[in-house]
Design a protein with these regions (language model features):
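Active-site and substrate-binding clefts of carbohydrate-active enzymes
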Residues: 1-30, 36-38, 156-158, 162-167, ...
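Short, well-structured secondary-structure segments
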Residues: 2-91, 115-119, 138-144, 241
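Generic structural signal for well-ordered alpha-helices
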Residues: 28-32, 63-67, 96-106, 129, ...
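Short, charged, surface-exposed secondary-structure boundary motifs
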Residues: 88-90, 148-156, 179-180, 249-252
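CE4/NodB-like, metal-dependent polysaccharide N-deacetylase domain
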Residues: 94-121, 195-212
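Gly/Pro-rich turn-and-neighbor structural signature
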Residues: 108, 113, 122-159
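Short His-Asn-centered micro-motif
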Residues: 118-122, 142-143, 170-172, 213-214
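Beta-strand-rich N-terminal accessory domains
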Residues: 355-434
Length: 435
């Protein structure tokens, strides 16, 4: 039986130096060194752009090793969105541009053009299928295990279709993902984990198995990188890569893969979509609405923006979806990173002549617009609910003082004498007039 073995990391944009170094020392170096020393081994690989950039700046020798393995045909790198954006959260015309930008970065730095696509945190939406072929890619790699239903959609490669466009999907073998998640959640020991992996790897199946292991979940346990050696030792030299497999096999099976958050990268509870996760959290929805407003402002003000390339780069960083996921949303470093680039966008746009940012905009989807007041020393979004400051930006520090509060600044509350219940001023809309 042939198998595809892969490794992926999704350390969010804005992660700390310590996290990058732990990933490198405990996972990347042992894994890449093992593949380099055995020319018969092949590995499917995914890192985020921010991770590649960190390696380029701090450990260029690692990127050189990755480049060498790509040229030898031992490593196939997956493309993805730029700076960890969930593709379904951005406009349709920007999805292809995001993928192509990542693909170009990988091609220029690692000598090979990616052929496959990875979805950040395995958030899949059928509407992104057309972007695969438009980006010149051949296949998608994603789990089809749905945490809500507890069911796995498919175990063999298949074609999925949307709007007349097809994309080939290599579904992950969820057994390995489950064992890795259990180790991460301390539901099993390293010894038992490696034993279970060895047992599964010894089983023969008639169809190809696609195994992708989450390095972020493994890096917390020292010695867990041995799992790759276990799989290679048991399953031998039958490992292949999707590109090679497609050149030797014809896929005829079709299956419609519905939208959802797949795999076991994080616990989603009863959530059925990324949109639900965002709209149920005031801070997330405000950030999402803000980024959408900034994107539309940039689009409508092309002729007024002198350095459009720099503006687009900042907007991509501000659009990072890493903030929205439970495992990362409590990380202050992620908050600061996402917040900084949003603030930088607002400062740059506010300094353009004729003030291109709309004076009223609904950034939190409550159907009541906020009023924007921009000055030299601060930029303020004044909510009509209780005159709360939804955002209070200090341009010199590129920070929003209200960002860490779900209610905004000055969301005062008091005890109602008649009902003895707490009431918030933010619950009542107020009319805002100019002085």
């Amino acid at each position: 039986m042939e198998y595809i073995l892969g490794a992926y990391s999704q350390l969010p944009f804005g992660s700390s130096r310590e996290e990058y170094e732990t990933l490198l020392s405990r996972q990347l170096k042992p894994l890449l060194t093992m593949v380099y020393r055995n020319s018969s081994l092949k590995l499917l690989f995914r890192l985020g752009i921010s991770e590649f950039e960190y390696l380029e700046q701090n450990h260029p020798e690692v990127n050189m090793l990755i480049n060498d393995l790509c040229r030898k045909g031992q490593l196939e790198i997956l493309s993805s969105s730029y700076y960890d954006v969930v593709l379904s959260l951005i406009p349709t015309h920007e999805r292809t541009a995001q993928i192509e930008k990542t693909t170009t970065y990988i091609r220029k730095n690692f000598s090979r053009k990616p052929r496959g696509l990875w979805f950040y945190n395995q958030v899949f939406n059928p509407t992104t299928v057309p972007a695969v072929s438009l980006s010149g890619l051949d296949y998608i790699v994603v789990s089809t295990y749905n945490q809500v239903s507890g069911m796995t959609e498919a175990t063999r490669p298949f074609y999925t279709e949307e709007m007349g466009k097809q994309a080939l999907v290599f579904p992950l073998d969820d057994r390995y993902s489950k064992e890795t998640a259990d180790l991460y959640n301390s539901s099993t020991t390293l010894e038992k984990y490696l034993s279970n992996i060895r047992k599964m790897a010894s089983e023969n199946t008639s169809s190809i198995s696609t195994i992708m292991l989450n390095l972020d979940q493994l890096m917390g346990t020292e010695g867990s990188s041995d799992v790759f050696k276990v799989i290679f030792d048991v399953m031998g030299n039958r490992c292949t890569l999707p590109g090679i497999y497609l050149s030797e096999n014809e896929i005829a099976r079709t299956h419609y893969l519905p939208g959802g958050i797949y795999g076991r990268d994080f616990r989603i509870g009863k959530l059925t979509s990324i949109n639900q996760l965002i709209y149920e959290n005031p801070k997330f929805s405000r950030n999402y609405g803000l980024v959408n407003m900034l994107r539309e402002t940039v689009r409508d003000s092309k002729r007024l923006i002198e350095d459009r390339k720099n503006m687009d780069q900042i907007l991509m960083k501000a659009s990072s979806s890493s903030l929205y996921f439970p495992d990362e949303c409590g990380n202050p470093a992620i908050h600061r990173s996402v917040n900084r680039y949003s603030c930088e966008m607002e400062v740059l746009l506010s300094r353009i002549s004729n003030m291109v940012i709309p004076e009223e905009t609904d950034i939190d989807f409550d159907r009541i617009p906020e009023s924007l007041i921009a000055g030299k020393s601060n930029i303020t979004y004044l909510s009509h609910r209780g005159a709360v400051l939804s955002r209070y930006i200090i341009p010199s520090a590129l920070t929003d003082l209200a960002f860490h509060s779900g209610d905004g600044l000055f969301a005062d509350s008091f005890i109602n004498d008649k009902t003895s219940k707490e009431m918030k001023l933010a619950a009542k809309p107020y009319e805002v007039t100019s002085l």
